[in-house]
Amino acid sequence: MSPTDDWRIGEVIKSATEKQVGFKWNFFVAFGTYVLITIALTVIQELTVGTGDSVAAALVELLVSLIMLPLGIGLGLLGIRRAAGKATPVSTLWEPYSDAIPIIVMFIMMTVLIVAGFFLLVLPGIYLAIAYSFAPYLIIEKKMGAWEALETSRKAITQYWWRYFGLMLLATLLFIVGSIPILIGLVWILPILGIATGEVFTKTFGADDGESLELEVD
């Protein structure tokens, strides 16, 4: 696999805008599921150990974060699959749990490295936070180990770090704009941003060996 940097911000946004048609329903069912589970776990935590400074509360909060980590990655996986022209059933949300152990190991390693980068000069931490963006998806889609995924993501994104950072800034701006009219714009913006990230991933690493499907339209 030879990562490539052959993509442009305008192109991925345009392609994502086209591909969000027929994708929004599954995306928001998955997103709603994520939100409901988050709320449920938060309520359970509050009713059992609370959210104070106790050791028990800290341990439960860490456990909840680790439980939710694969689920959040599943949301991003929907965008990657859509960008690659593959089926995006709501069940995609649960797929990262089959790789939960390497994902958690990767997350711990990534956190240590990013925090160390921030302690050094801040800028290395920012660089790594962006450069490691694709690591969890390389574990799922390319069956890499934790360290291999981190290094592959870092080396690939380094080729176009500023361009990808620009895409993230644009995504933030679009999110803010979409939030202004009582959040209605996010119905389109969130799926577009998810697919746009998936477009970059797919253009960089290629699609996996799964069967490509014709994109459905509303």
What do the PLM-derived regions correspond to, one by one?
Residues 45-46, 58-62, 101-102, 116-122, ...:
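Short, functional N-terminal and low-complexity linear motifs
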Residues 38-51, 178-179:
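Juxtamembrane "helix exit" motif at the C-terminal ends of alpha-helical transmembrane segments
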Residues 34, 42, 46, 76-78:
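Hydrophobic alpha-helical segments of integral membrane proteins
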Residues 4-37, 87-116, 128-179, 217-218:
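Interfacial aromatic "cap" segments that immediately flank transmembrane helices
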Residues 3-4, 53-87, 111-151, 179-211:
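Selective recognition of hydrophobic, aromatic-rich stretches within alpha-helical transmembrane segments
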